């Protein structure tokens, strides 16, 4: 009998991802990472996705007030091993400390594009036409 697999993360992956997100946030808020770029930037961590074996944590971050996100993402990835070590002190219940990878969170940009599309005159006209038919 084979087990059905789904692409949705398990409850355990979600729970551990949230714990890792909170721990990374604390490390960054305390200013434990000594890097001029990171210290000068407000960083929002929207989500941490865990691999199924819980050995890789991909943190989706949004640097606020910075036009070039790649500079901040590169700085975070340079210090990923140090951040991983700091996580080990906070997440003692984990058997393996996950490798941390930082990626730019583009979901806000996607939401903004969708909102702009919905507010465009063409779409508004189509939506109003649908309401008239009902």
UniProtKB/Swiss-Prot annotation:
Family that this chain belongs to: Belongs to the RbfA family.
GO annotation, biological process: maturation of SSU-rRNA
InterPro entries reported for this sequence: KH_dom-like_a/b (IPR015946), RbfA (IPR000238), RbfA_dom_sf (IPR023799), Ribosome-bd_factorA_CS (IPR020053)
Gene3D superfamilies, per the entry: 3.30.300.20
Assembly with partners or alone: Monomer. Binds 30S ribosomal subunits, but not 50S ribosomal subunits or 70S ribosomes.
Purpose of the protein: One of several proteins that assist in the late maturation steps of the functional core of the 30S ribosomal subunit. Associates with free 30S ribosomal subunits (but not with 30S subunits that are part of 70S ribosomes or polysomes). Required for efficient processing of 16S rRNA. May interact with the 5'-terminal helix region of 16S rRNA.
HAMAP family named among the record's database cross-references: RbfA
An annotated GO cellular component: cytosol
Keyword Nucleus: no
Gene: rbfA
Entry annotated with the keyword Cytoplasm: yes
Main subcellular localisation: cytoplasm
Record localization: Cytoplasm
Protein name as it appears in the record: Ribosome-binding factor A
GO molecular function: ribosomal small subunit binding
Keyword entries, A-Z: Cytoplasm, Ribosome biogenesis
């Amino acid at each position: 009998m084979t087990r059905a697999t789904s692409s949705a993360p398990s409850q355990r992956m979600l729970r551990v991802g949230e714990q890792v997100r909170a721990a990374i946030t604390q490390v960054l808020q305390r200013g434990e990472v000594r890097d001029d770029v990171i210290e000068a930037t407000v960083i929002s961590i929207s989500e941490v996705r865990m691999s199924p074996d819980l050995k890789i944590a991909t943190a989706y971050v949004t640097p606020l007030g910075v036009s070039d996100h790649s500079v901040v993402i590169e700085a975070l990835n340079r210090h990923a091993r140090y951040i991983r070590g700091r996580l080990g002190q906070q997440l003692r219940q984990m058997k393996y400390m996950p490798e941390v990878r930082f990626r730019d969170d583009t979901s806000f940009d996607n939401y903004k594009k969708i909102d702009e599309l919905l507010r465009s005159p063409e779409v508004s006209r189509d939506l109003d036409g649908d309401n008239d038919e009902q």
